[in-house]
Amino acid sequence: MPLNFADVGEENIIKKIGGKPEVKKHLENLGFVVGGTVKVINKLGGNVIVNVKEARIAISEEMAQKIMV
């Protein structure tokens, strides 16, 4: 399922990252890698706030849809 559908407080394993190569590279640089864990902290104002690799990051729902967990 896409990351934006994950429940708040739930830790998930990243299974796939979709999108164009430059989008994949950008997400990888932020710490979103296949096999890594990501935890949804909050959802507000069209953004998804997550913990990934011990960092708190806000990404748009559009970006979150490209991350399959």
PLM regions with names:
Residues M1-V69:
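Compact, glycine-rich, soluble single-domain proteins
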